[in-house]
């Protein structure tokens, strides 16, 4: 079979011929139909993500859409290493598969997986969002952020505040369900005032943070003094991505003086059962609502040239 192979952590994967996997007991061999390229997969392939392995070669890809020998079409997660999803065939535990409805396209299902986990897993599994609560999405102009807006609306959020730097992209978020926007390009003091207004005056119960770095620091600083004297819902700050940096400066006094609860959502903070439940809920909702996501299908044979491509659409490799 042919597969994308990470042969070192400094170069993009290469399209190579390699022996197909053989399933163990309890596993299923899948013919892969589609596998999406995410920042998570890029990070694992270059060794920078916390879940990266240390041994090469391996095939990248944590999830995708495949077909079993019996014809069942499924979405799958967690292929057995070193067999990832970016290959003609892969192997996964049967327990790590979700049947897909016939009306969901292969490439769309694959593209929804990573941002879907980031969003559904965060809102349901970690933040436990309740209908009527307000959500602030930090970094809402990316693929996952746009999904988060739509999902928060679907789950009954009363208000959805979206942040980002690209003014044109911010202006388009209202069509997805954002009720307010905050520009991250404004001066720091103005940004703090905007966040204080959102947290203290308007009221926010859940923050989804796709960025970390300076904007996350500003949100947390704005929350200082916003305690819980009247028993109002606390601010559940869910950290999901770190595009703007891996570290921030956090005052101990901020945590003591506020109702902020810091949470993380990702591989390790969510159980396999919680991940599968979140994704099953997502695909059920997709059959009803059709969440907007822009995709760019690419033949897997073009993996090396597409790997470092910068574009707004989600690249989906088709073996």
Predicted regions and their residues:
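Mid-domain Rossmann-like dinucleotide-binding core that forms the NAD(H)/NADP(H) cofactor-binding site
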Residues: 112-186
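NAD(P)H dinucleotide-binding glycine-rich loop of Rossmann-like/cofactor-binding domains
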Residues: 62-63, 74-139
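Local beta-strand N-terminus motif with an aromatic residue
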Residues: 87, 132, 178, 203-204, ...
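Glycine-rich beta-strand-centered segment in the early N-terminal region that forms part
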Residues: 19-37, 48-84, 96
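Adenosine-nucleotide cofactor-binding segment
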Residues: 153-226, 280
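Glycine-rich phosphate-binding loop and adjacent beta-alpha segment
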Residues: 214-288
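C-terminal hydrophobic helical "lid"/dimerization subdomain
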Residues: 227, 272-319
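Short, glycine/polar-rich helix-capping loops at beta-to-alpha or helix-loop-helix junctions
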Residues: 85-86, 164-174, 247-252
